[in-house]
A protein has these predicted regions:
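Short helix-loop "hinge" at the ATP-lid/N-box region of the Bergerat-fold HATPase_c
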Residues: 75-76
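Helix-loop junction within the histidine kinase core
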Residues: 8-19
């Protein structure tokens, strides 16, 4: 239901974005604290960040948390054992940061990757959800002036990477 409401807000242009400067490590620690107890048995959630806790982004923290939570929830659906690792790293282009969520799950086929951000697309028919979450994530990240990409290897796992500018107007 929330995904359908978000999709409606996106399409009507009524989804609000509140840009402000936010401490990225604190934002990600908050996500970790709320998500770690939701992991399936045998799956460990790992937060990986540089030592400094002084990374700030001008972004909408509510929407960014929504995206990271969605990516972690998706990873948990397809990871029966192992790790879901998320965090951030500086991009090779100065002024940008990469936020990532990677898992040791079942992976996504090349065909699946081609369609993964399409509305209503689901990798299989057995998982919950309407197939809207990743499409909504992509739209939110674009509104945050960023990009989202995916790499995957079947049976080895998947990595979603969100690339955002440190500052935007």
């Amino acid at each position: 239901i929330n995904d359908i409401l978000d999709l409606s807000r996106i399409e009507s242009g009524t989804m609000e974005f509140m840009f402000a400067e936010h401490n990225l490590p604190l934002l990600l620690k908050t996500v970790h604290d709320s998500q770690r107890l939701n992991m399936p048995p045998g799956v460990e959630l790992v937060l990986r960040m540089p030592e400094s806790d002084k990374k700030y982004l001008t972004t909408d923290n509510v929407r960014l948390q929504q995206v990271v939570n969605n990516l972690i929830n998706n990873a948990a659906k397809f990871t029966s054992s192992g790790f879901i690792t998320f965090g951030y790293e500086d991009d090779e282009v100065p002024g940008y940061t990469r936020i990532f969520v990677e898992d040791t799950g079942v992976g996504i086929s090349e065909e699946g990757i081609r369609h993964i951000f399409e509305r209503f697309y689901k990798v299989d028919n057995f998982t919950q959800g309407a197939g809207l979450g990743l499409s909504i994530c992509q739209t939110i990240i674009e509104r945050l002036n960023g990009t989202i990409s995916v790499t995957s290897e079947v049976v080895k796992g998947t990595r979603f990477t969100v690339r955002l500018p440190n500052y935007c107007e």
